[in-house]
Swiss-Prot record:
It comes from the Eukaryota. The keyword Protein biosynthesis does not apply. It is found in: Nucleus, Nucleolus. The gene is NOL11. SUPFAM superfamilies: WD40 repeat-like (SSF50978). Ribosome biogenesis factor. May be required for both optimal rDNA transcription and small subunit (SSU) pre-rRNA processing at sites A', A0, 1 and 2b. The modification N6-methyllysine is found at residue 346. This is Nucleolar protein 11. Transmembrane segments: none annotated.
Amino acid sequence: MAALEEEFTLSSVVLSAGPEGLLGVEQSDKTDQFLVTDSGRTVILYKVSDQKPLGSWSVKQGQIITCPAVCNFQTGEYVVVHDNKVLRIWNNEDVNLDKVFKATLSAEVYRILSVQGTEPLVLFKEGAVRGLEALLADPQQKIETVISDEEVIKWTKFFIVFRHRVLIFITEKHGNYFAYVQMFNSRILTKYTLLLGQDENSVVESFTASVDRKFISLMSLSSDGCIYETLIPIRPTDPEKNQSLVRSLLLKAVVSDNTQNGVALTALDQDHVAVLGSPLAASKECLSVWNIKFQTLQTSKELSQGTSGQVWYYGEHLFMLHGKSLTVIPYKCEVSSLAGALGKLKHSQDPGTHVVPHFVNWETPQGCGLGFQNSEQSRRILRRRKTEVSLQPEVPPSKQLLSTIMKDSEKHIEVEVRKFLALKQTPDFHTVVGDTVTGLLERCKAEPSFYPRNCLMQLIQTHVLSYSLCPDLMEIALKKKDVQLLQLCLQQFPDIPESVTCACLKIFLSIGDDSLQETDVSMESVFDYSNSVHDEKMEEQTEILQNGFNPEEDKCNNCDQELNKKPQDETKESTSCPVVQKRAALLNAILHSAFSETFLLPHLKDIPAQHITLFLKYLYFLYLKCSENATMTLPGIHPPTLNQIMDWICLLLDANFTVVVMMPEAKRLLINLYKLVKSQITVYSELNKIEVSFRELQKLNQEKNNRGLYSIEVLELF
């Protein structure tokens, strides 16, 4: 009989779960340890038995993790991808992800898959698959496109079947679903069309799968609340032919078709599945365990605080977001038999039976395909490389374009580059772009008068470059004080060091307004401040309005007196932008850039105090603009967020407060910032009080609904 034991909270730390929940929960190389990746910037290693985190790692602000972190079971290292293309590898001894091994890939990654006994696989969004070792040998290698246009990967699973690796992934296009099965021992990729049957209008909400000797049992939970099964052969009869598979009804009406927070399905063993959702239209979310062999509900647990519609299962533990905390529910299923009741249960397993373990196979494959390049040597070596990145791939360059770069004029080079970019992308497109930029930069160093900025800007806009691939690019742009090129690099490169970011900030603050007027910069992040509607009362009030909140309890009498004495011209100055619009666009690019506070603060101390004051005035102006509306956002296509504004205010004050406080012209600004922070603290304090009150009301209103459950107990007679 299957049973769900008492749940417990893995950590009281509130995870950064987005609208779709967490990115994933993956098992570590220790049985009791798991990697949890939130939907923002953080990976946390938890130990379930101790109910506490063992380590936490975050990418820089401005970067975002795009697929769950996994463990490389061969080396004990962890692997994660942020910003779709940047791969990071680290271990427990590493503290900061900025200093660990990094590789910038040539295509966007969908998921990294890892199981015991083999190296991880990297599945790209275009359907191609690479072994991790083969990919690290040449990160910029060409990645082929497997799936068709507008086809999107929805789900994937990695199995080990009789020492052979099998990968399955499901795609969707215009409501049609397809299954791809990759056999790595024979390098066979088979495509199947999944026919939905009679209910063609239903949408598949969740997938799960188990495997036996001949078939992959693909189970899907549809929007009609039913679970369907599709049997996919592991060894197809005709791999070259696109075959169709019809699904069959497995369980009917296991969840309501009106579930708001989504549903989830996961296989527990060959006979049981866990379903997360609302069983009835008016009921709360529940975690239910069903016996698919006898089509019966085994047990159910109500989740009163709601979930994210996600569930993961490893080693007799079910993981899910319950409310705001990561919750673990132990699961056990013991086989009832007459022999067990008599104490004569056979403990030796019949060789003919096959039981699906937590990982399908723990044995190591020998000589499997897909890039097993001397993996024995790689298993013994931990990657402790901190900053070693191959700056240029070793693929032969395009000789014609490179010869043009080395000897022709800037206009001719620009024409040739434009012709190359207008052509359809070739297999060596990424390599040629990298080599072209390298050749241009080498000639710039050799000939100071040579500076093909138009060519460089066109190549940057191909979205295949990064700072680690061409670090000399921004160095030359800084020497030339080319703010347009620097702005473009800040917008396109996800891995710019903090020292370079601060160097750009110095130039953006020091360049004259006359020089900016002659420069063409991107203005999409800036709106017309002069045409914005101001509330006339805003100029007269002395307090900061924080989202409609007026801190009447502010007792800073001295501050109030100082602000009440300010002349009219200074009042207008506080409600008008302190910088011209083009400088504002450049500063917005700085606000959007990724950074690590530890490495950024030392460089901020080198910026002159008058420039720091100007930047603080601009940030304070942006905050006032945010506070004019209830959403606390700025108009525009890609404006700075309130969090970015507050982060930079704190950083600038932390680095330069002792210098700024001595400047008479900064006195009023510091008083305004003081009141700003005080009002923020007051608002969040009141919000916390409201949250506590809501929790108490929720506890009073909770009612436990007793549902009548039944089960079929199977007795095995020997």
